[in-house]
Regions:
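Intrinsically disordered, low-complexity polar regions and short flexible loop motifs
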Residues: 1-244
Length: 244
C-alpha cells in the first residue's frame, strides 16, 4: 500500500449541514505496518493519538490490542477474556487497558502452531485495576477473522447508566460498538400537556409488582430514574380520565 507522509483533515458537519474543519495532521505510513489515528476529546480541544502496529500474516488466528479514550485519561481497566459460555471466574487476565497506549495481549492457550488467539467466540470483562468486581461485560463476541482486533474503551453519552462503550475495530471501515450486557438505563419525563391536572406515568416491566409511577404537574420535568434492561409498557393517565 501507500507509504510516506499523508495529510489527514478531520471535519464535522454542523447544524447547517456545513463542513467545519476540526484539525489537519500529518502521519507517516510505513511498509507492513498499520497506522491507527484516534480522535477524542471535544471539537474545541481535540486529542489525536497515532498508533502503529506490525501487520502479520495470520491463519486461523487473530491478534488482540486495546487502548482507552475515556474523558478521564487516568482511568485504566483490567482486561479479562473467557471462552464463550464460561463465567468470569473462568476468565483469563490479559493485562491493563491504558489511555494513550496501544497494548497487545498474549493468548493464554497458545500452541506450537501459533501463540496468537484462536478464531472463536469469547466474552470480554473489564474491572477496575486489581479488583475482581466486573464493571463491564460484553455479550458473546465472534472473533472469526484472521486479523488484528483493536478494542477501544470510550465514554458513552445517552441513557445508559455506566456511560461506557467498547468499540471493536477491524480492517473494514465499520466500527462495532459493544455495550455492557448488564447496563441499566435512565429515563426522565416531561409533562407538556395543556391541562390543569397532573399526569401520572407508569412504567411496567415483566414484573407488574415492580411498576414505577411518577406524577408530574403541567410543565414539570421528572428526575432521572434508573431501570433495568428490558421491555416496558408505558401508560399515562389524568385523575379526571381525560387521558389514558
Amino acid at each position: 500500500g501507500e507509504k510516506g507522509d499523508l495529510e489527514l483533515e478531520f471535519y464535522r458537519i454542523d447544524s447547517d449541514d456545513q463542513e467545519v474543519v476540526i484539525d489537519t495532521i500529518t502521519v507517516t505510513l510505513k511498509t507492513s505496518y498499520k497506522t491507527l489515528v484516534v480522535l477524542s476529546g471535544d471539537f474545541e480541544s481535540p486529542v489525536f493519538d497515532t498508533y502503529e502496529y506490525y501487520r502479520e500474516s495470520l491463519e486461523d488466528h487473530f491478534r488482540l490490542l486495546a487502548t482507552s479514550t475515556m474523558f478521564d485519561s487516568t482511568t485504566t481497566f483490567d482486561l479479562y477474556m473467557s471462552d464463550s459460555g464460561d463465567p468470569f471466574e473462568a476468565a483469563n487476565y490479559l493485562g491493563t487497558i491504558t489511555s494513550g497506549e496501544l497494548t497487545e495481549y498474549t493468548y493464554w492457550d497458545g500452541d506450537d502452531d501459533s501463540e496468537d488467539f484462536n478464531e472463536d467466540e469469547y466474552t470480554i470483562y473489564l474491572t477496575e485495576p486489581g479488583s475482581d468486581e466486573v464493571i463491564f461485560e460484553t455479550p458473546t463476541l465472534s472473533l472469526a477473522y484472521n486479523t488484528e482486533y483493536v478494542l477501544i474503551t470510550r465514554d458513552l453519552s445517552g441513557a445508559i447508566q455506566n456511560g461506557m462503550a467498547l468499540d471493536v475495530l477491524l480492517n473494514s471501515t465499520t466500527v462495532y460498538e459493544v455495550t455492557d450486557v448488564d447496563a441499566t438505563s435512565q429515563y426522565r419525563i416531561y409533562n407538556s400537556l395543556n391541562t390543569d391536572s397532573p399526569v401520572t406515568v407508569t412504567f411496567t416491566g415483566d414484573d407488574e409488582a415492580e411498576a414505577i409511577s411518577v406524577q408530574l404537574a403541567p410543565g414539570e420535568v421528572g428526575e432521572f430514574t434508573e431501570v433495568e434492561y428490558g421491555d416496558y409498557r408505558i401508560t399515562a393517565s389524568i385523575a379526571d380520565n381525560s387521558l389514558t
